[in-house]
Amino acid sequence: MHRLLLVSCFLLLNSWAWALKPTREWIATPDSLGLRYQTTALSTPDHAQLAGWIVEPAATVPDRHTTVVVAYGDANNMSHFLSQARALSQGGYRVYLFDYRGFGHSSDFAIDRQRLYYPEFSTDLRTVLADARHRYPRSRTGIIGFSMGTIMGSEVAATSKCDFLVAEGYVASPQLLVAAIFQRSQKVVTLPAEAAEYALVARRVRCPWLLVGGTADKSMPLADSVAVARAARWRQRRQVLCFEGGHLEGFYRLTEAEYGDKYVREVTRFLAGKRS
């Protein structure tokens, strides 16, 4: 099953929708990878119902007492990120996966498949982050966002209590992204009105922030992540982790003995205050 999920991850890396493309059916559950987990069912302030999984740290490694909430991208559902969750679990992390409204087994939500994202997804992430903090008050709790999920991740980190943010394939400008999509493929992708304020978000992120990017990522250039890190002001700790590869290939490229093991070690180094 783990091999099948790795194949799914590889296909996912090469099939980004660049607009919303949710799927309802889970391709696996955590127990199929031998992961210890529990299910969650949350209600957001605006009454959406969210399905989630909390994957516990592997029993064979020291517990880092750190909870990582996963904000994935624009396609599929949380089951497609079980391989990343497994790698983090094997590194001693608790991993909180969830489905946005309209994705997976969460409640229905009318989605325009030409839309890049909805602000309601930030409400979903904020709800899950708050639940994680409530369940594990003595745990360090933060967010790892991928692609579109970096929009929600940075917005929530800027406005909520968040101990750290990891952003791979960081979206620096939704407006430039949709313009690039149109230039490349003549595909029209729309933005919510709230996107007009997104340029102000990065400067408000106060927690430690690790930006992960590929040298060959043409969609979210590594230079954008470098610029955000260099713009850090006093007491804003930001660092860039780069790898040789394309969009969202970080776990795949930063692998030595096991899938994503080097990636997880670099996250651990960052959270410990060490530089790569």
Question: What is each model feature region?
Answer:
Residues L13-S43, A48-A58:
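An N-terminal hydrophobic leader/cap segment in hydrolases
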Residues D74-A87, Y100, A223:
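The serine-hydrolase catalytic nucleophile loop
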Residues Q84, C207, P221-A231:
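Short alpha-helix in the alpha/beta-hydrolase fold that links the catalytic acid
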Residues L88-D108:
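Conserved alpha/beta-hydrolase
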Residues Q114-R135:
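Alpha/beta-hydrolase active-site loop
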Residues I151-A195, V201:
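Hydrolase active-site cap/lid region
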Residues V205, L211-G213, D217:
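Short beta-strand/loop motif that positions the catalytic acidic residue
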Residues Q236-S276:
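C-terminal catalytic histidine-bearing segment of alpha/beta-hydrolase fold enzymes
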